[in-house]
Amino acid sequence: MHGHSRNGQAHVPRRKRRNRFVKKNGQCNVYFANLSNKSQRYMADIFTTCVDTRWRYMLMIFSAAFLVSWLFFGLLFWCIAFFHGDLEPSPSGPTAGGPGGNGGGAAPTAAKPCIMHVNGFLGAFLFSVETQTTIGYGFRCVTEECPLAVIAVVVQSIVGCVIDSFMIGTIMAKMPRPKKRAQTLLFSHHAVISVRDGKLCLMWRVGNLRKSHIVEAHVRAQLIKPYMTQEGEYLPLDQRDLNVGYDIGLDRIFLVSPIIIVHEIDEDSPLYGMGKEELESEDFEIVVILEGMVEATAMTTQARSSYLASEILWGHRFEPVVFEEKSHYKVDYSRFHKTYEVAGTPCCSARELQESKITVLPAPPPPPSAFCYENELALMSQEEEEMEEEAAAAAAVAAGLGLEAGSKEETGIIRMLEFGSHLDLERMQAATLPLDNISYRRESAI
């Protein structure tokens, strides 16, 4: 049911908010379901499974592995001692042939145990812990009476070394992982679209909160939106690249201070036909990725974020955050996410803006100051030659009419021509052309 506003206009219901494919903190909002043999596949790659798992789960797994191995071999040692008869109480008291008896026979000798000083399961468990951890208290030990007990000690020592090596290797592989390094790489809360150098551009800001650098840092961006092919196939997550300067190397950045990443909306951009109104009604997501190597460990790290269509501000720019001080540059991160509105930003799409420039705006005429000085001198010389030709023709006409060569009139005409040529020469010498900035820019451009 459509509602109505107070002024009588129909109220258009808001589009359902799109589920993020990548969350703002960089986590991918994807759930895997109905995987066949998932446990077997994860156990086949147990090392990667342990490295990817959380610390608390990993410590619980290794603690359980140690405890199970201690209990298993403790039970094994207890069984060996039990079946050998080491757990039975030794006979005590005087014998028939001993002192106070009538007989003169010797006392019976007690059998040698397999494991010394193991009188129950608790003692066997302690002996198992001492063997696997190589504590070596020296109170309990295995004798040569039972070869099975010796074999059990050897096997437990090997198993203990394997568990220790696996745990240490997993911890050493997990500790230097640059996963948490992405927490100190910052993306702006919003992206903006405004005019830069006469073209509409999509921009967002990235920053590094640590003083340690990200080596070989480079950025990528992809637009994800539903797409219907010509054959009617529906693609819910169609991915299109956004060019951020791959061809000329602008995608590689020196991330010491916050930098604004620019995507120029041109003919190859998926946003080329999208204006302000289309942006408000579109359903898409822009995933931005920052990759590089951690300076301390030389391991590759990746930071991700995303912007929905509702998080892109049309006609805005980012406030400056880098300020020059007397001896250094100051970065004010309190302004990192702030933007300001730019008046005069066109609301049309980049395609319409380009077409309006081609069809409506005429080419500006060249300014008079664009003429070079040599062309001006050539024009003046041509005028002077024409005046001399006219003077020669007048002299020829006067000679044809019978005028004397030395007459005063001819002398006056010649002096007049010389005076005119002298004035032209002074005008040429005093001629200066005012060259403005536009002419200089054009000459440098040529």
Curated annotation (Swiss-Prot):
Q: Where is this motif: PDZ-binding?
A: 444-446
What are the BP-aspect GO terms? cellular response to mechanical stimulus; potassium ion import across plasma membrane; regulation of monoatomic ion transmembrane transport
Provide the membrane-side ranges marked Cytoplasmic in the record: 1-55, 171-446
Q: Which reaction does it catalyse?
A: K(+)(in) = K(+)(out)
Regions that span the bilayer: 56-80, 149-170
Where are the intramembrane regions? 121-132, 133-139
State its location(s).
Cell membrane; Cytoplasmic vesicle membrane; Postsynaptic cell membrane
Give the matching InterPro entries.
Ig_E-set, IRK_C, K_chnl_inward-rec_Kir, K_chnl_inward-rec_Kir2.3, K_chnl_inward-rec_Kir_cyto, Kir_TM
In alphabetical order, the GO MF annotations are:
inward rectifier potassium channel activity; PDZ domain binding
Write out the similarity annotation: Belongs to the inward rectifier-type potassium channel (TC 1.A.2.1) family. KCNJ4 subfamily.
Q: How does it assemble?
A: Homomultimeric and heteromultimeric association with KCNJ2 and KCNJ12. Interacts with DLG2 and DLG4. Associates, via its PDZ-recognition domain, with a complex containing LIN7A, LIN7B, LIN7C, DLG1, CASK and APBA1. Interacts with TAX1BP3. TAX1BP3 competes with LIN7 family members for KCNJ4 binding.
What the protein does comes down to: Inward rectifier potassium channels are characterized by a greater tendency to allow potassium to flow into the cell rather than out of it. Their voltage dependence is regulated by the concentration of extracellular potassium; as external potassium is raised, the voltage range of the channel opening shifts to more positive voltages. The inward rectification is mainly due to the blockage of outward current by internal magnesium. Can be blocked by extracellular barium and cesium.
The name under which this protein is listed is: Inward rectifier potassium channel 4
Q: Which organism is it from?
A: Rattus norvegicus (Rat)
Q: What is the lineage of its organism?
A: Eukaryota, Metazoa, Chordata, Craniata, Vertebrata
Coding gene? Kcnj4
